[in-house]
């Protein structure tokens, strides 16, 4: 893997699932029509925050972030949870 995320006309639901896997985040598209929105982009080296900011420039969306923590045997586990909604 070369650190690139490449999307070629993929539904946003799939795009956010793949981004979430890479950045250890649960990203949920709350609007069914928006989830089907086809997206094309290449990201390389951006942080999750940068990717979300860039996507807002071309997709009619906003996002609400909630971070949750879960106690694990070896310490506290933190994961980002992000809801994506239509503007």
Place the predicted regions along the sequence by residue.
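A residue-level detector for the "anchor" residue at the start of short, highly conserved motifs
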Residues: 1-87
């Amino acid at each position: 893997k070369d650190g690139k995320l490449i999307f070629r006309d993929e539904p946003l639901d799939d795009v956010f699932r793949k981004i979430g896997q890479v950045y250890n985040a649960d990203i949920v598209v709350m609007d069914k029509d928006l989830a089907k929105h086809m997206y094309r982009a290449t990201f390389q080296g951006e942080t999750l925050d940068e990717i979300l900011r860039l996507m807002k420039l071309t997709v009619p969306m906003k996002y609400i972030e909630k971070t949750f923590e879960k106690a694990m045997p070896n310490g506290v586990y933190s994961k980002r949870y992000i809801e994506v909604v239509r503007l």
